Amino acid sequence: MLNRDAIRSGAFLESFSHLPPEILWTQAQIAQSLADTMAKRPAGEEVWVFGYGSLMWNPLSHFDQRAYATLHGWRRSFCIRLFGGRGTPQRPGRMLALERGGDTQGVVLRLDTATLEEELHILWTREMLTGAYTPAWTTVTLATGKTRHALAFVANTCPHQYEADSSPATVARAIAQAHGPLGSNAEYVFQLRQALADCAMTDAYVEEVAQALEGFETTS
């Protein structure tokens, strides 16, 4: 179960202990990534986080403002091989990230300043377990036209997990057969599709992957 208690107790980290050391980050590496990223934080700015995947429906970190936003220059991509959570080393799934090109609609969350240190710890433990992402300070555009600096976790194209082929047909085949302690990989895709619909948003790429998965279910 992915929740605050699991992260605080260490149970979430423990559920990934089967991963090889070249993939699983240590707590020291996670803490260093957080420190390095916050050292680049825009001066005097509150911390906003851009959610484009499960942060849209299960943010875990406490926030005091939420708004719809668009991140220009980045697109959703199931380009990360998933060895834990909703996949295994034997049957890896695909994890969502952002790659260059296009635009992405999502939400921005302003982390609660009163508990900012804890919220960031929870966020980094959740997102940076394997170093599959690169935390980046970006600029998002709100529905009002205003802009905000926001953290976005984009694909790290260097580690073992990155896959260049993230076409809907390719990723759907991997996602269809992947399961793990957090459930099926396909369930994630359908939850993402619903979260987008709940925000009156669409993503053609996500829809293609979801439809391909439905095709597998129909023929199985």
Label for each model-derived stretch:
Residues 1-220:
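A glycine-rich, hydrophobic/aromatic-adjacent loop/helix-cap motif
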